[in-house]
Amino acid sequence: MAIRLTHLRKPLAYSRSFDVCIPFFRSISSFEAVEKAIKCAVETKEYLRIPELVVSLKEPYQNSTLFSFLSAFQRHHRIRVIDEILQSFVPVRPRSLPKIVYSSLLTYCLQSSDPLPLSFAILQRTLRSGCLPNPQTHLLLSDAWLERRRGSQSVADIINEMKLIGYSPDTGTCNYLVSSLCAVDKLDEAIKVVEEMSAAGCIPDVESYGAVINSLCLARKTTDVVKIVKEMVSKAGISPRKGMLTKVAAALRANREIWKAIEMIEFVESRDYPVEFESYEVVVEGCLEVREYILAGKVVMRMTDRGFIPYIKVRQKVVERLINIGEWKLACTVRQRVSELRS
C-alpha cells in the first residue's frame, strides 16, 4: 500500500520551542550533545537547524549513529520524518549546506534493516542538491541492492518502490547505483541495471553506458564491452562521448583483438556516429603490433577518407612494413593519400 506523505514546500519558521530543548546549541561540541539536539530538532520540526548543529561539531561526523535515534520510530513515522527533513532542505542556499546531513542520513538508512527504497530518496535529494555521497556509499548501496536482488525481484520493481513513498525514480539515481556496482566489480549486475532501468521510466544515458564501458575496459572484458557499445548506438541511439571508443579500442588492442576493434568502428560508423582520430590511431598501432601490415594500410586509407592523417612515426612505419612484405602498390597509395591531405 502506498504511503501518503505531506511534503514541506517552504522553509520552516524558527520556533522558540527549539530554545526550550537546547538553549545554547552553538556551544555544543560533543557528539552526544549534538545528537540529542538533533533529536530535539526533529521532535519540534526545526529541521533547518540540523545543518548548523552538525557543523558545530569539532569533526565532520558522517556516519549512521548521528541519526540512530530514528530506529526507535515506527517505519511509517520514520519515513515521514526523513521526507520532511529532505523537503525542508530544498530551498536552502547554498544547496551544499546540508551535505553532511544528507551523508549521515544516507549512511544510516543504508545500514538499517530496510534500506530501500528510502535510501534512493535520500540519494536522489543529495544528487539534486549538487552534492556527492561519501565514497563508502558505493559499497553500502551495492550491498543493499544485491541483498534485495537475491529475492528474485526485478530491477524495475525495486526502483519503482520509490513511488510508494512519494518519490519518482530518475536516471541520475540509477546512474549512481550503476557506478556503485561498477566500483565493487559487480559488472554483470551493473549491466542488468542499465539494460532494465528503462522499465522503471529511467532512460539510460551516456553516463549510464559510460560507467559500465569504463569498468569493462579496465577489466578487459572485451566481448561484453563491444556488445554494450553496439547496444548504446543501435538500441539507445546514443552517440559515444569523446574518448569512449578510444578506450574500448585500447582494451581490444591490449588483448590483441584488433579485428574486433575494426569491426566495432565499422559498426558505429554504419549507424552514422563519428569515430574520433585517436580511436583510429590506436587501431593502426595495434595492427602493427600484431603484424597485420596490410590491415594497417587499409585502416590508414579509411582514416584519410575521413580527413585524418596518422602521426608521422606511425604512417612511416606502415609504409615501411608494407614495402618490406612486397606490398609496394598499397604502400605507394597510402603515401600518396597522406601527401594529398597534407597539401
Curated annotation (Swiss-Prot):
Alphabetical UniProt keywords: Repeat
Cellular component terms (Gene Ontology): plastid membrane
Keyword Repeat among UniProt keywords: yes
Pfam family, one: PPR_2
TM helices/strands, residue ranges: none
Keyword DNA-binding: no
PPR repeat residue intervals: 98-133, 134-169, 170-204, 205-240, 241-275, 276-310
Family: Belongs to the PPR family. P subfamily.
PANTHER family on file: MEMBRANE-ASSOCIATED SALT-INDUCIBLE PROTEIN-LIKE, OS04G0684500 PROTEIN
Protein name in UniProt: Pentatricopeptide repeat-containing protein At1g06270
Organism (species): Arabidopsis thaliana (Mouse-ear cress)
